[in-house]
């Protein structure tokens, strides 16, 4: 499909897209601040220039836009010039993976939050997951005797034997 804008119109439109202080970033930053976490923004000396840096906990947080970083959400797929955008997004994803690997190799904890995870329906769950992840990091840095095990889907062991279908207590 042909572009309906002149190059000047396209340039003006694209130049207005914000890369900093986006609404999803502000949601995360406000929540972190209210939880008592202090941070720096866009530290140039770190690979990928993370959105949020908590040096005390050696943790960086990237708040990624689903379109620009290729999350794959249905409503964030390009409608025009698809080939260009597909190549651009692949390059962005490769760059993101490279930056995250460099940060992890340097001993940083990397947390990625996607724009769609901060939509009103999922925001609370996402912030709870962030709270859990940061709690684990804080415990690890404070020398907790044993980290919490990762939650998995394996069957749990019950403290009591399973109830019989004929048991009068089960009604």
Each PLM stretch: what is its role?
Residues 1-112, 116-171:
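Nucleic-acid endo/exonuclease domains
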């Amino acid at each position: 499909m042909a572009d309906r804008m002149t190059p000047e119109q396209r340039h003006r439109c694209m130049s207005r897209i914000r890369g900093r202080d986006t609404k999803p970033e502000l949601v995360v930053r406000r929540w972190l601040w209210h939880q008592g976490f202090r941070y720096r923004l866009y530290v140039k000396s770190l690979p990928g220039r993370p959105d949020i840096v908590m040096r005390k906990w050696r943790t960086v947080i990237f708040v990624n836009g689903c379109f620009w970083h290729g999350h794959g959400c249905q409503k964030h797929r390009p409608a025009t010039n698809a080939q260009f955008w597909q190549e651009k997004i692949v390059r962005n994803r490769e760059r993101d993976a490279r930056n995250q690997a460099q940060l992890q190799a340097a001993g940083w904890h990397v947390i990625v939050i996607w724009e769609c995870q901060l939509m009103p329906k999922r925001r609370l769950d996402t912030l709870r997951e962030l709270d859990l992840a940061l709690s684990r990091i804080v415990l690890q840095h404070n020398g907790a005797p044993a980290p919490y095990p990762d939650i998995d889907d394996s069957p749990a062991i019950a403290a009591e034997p399973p109830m019989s279908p004929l048991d009068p207590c089960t009604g």
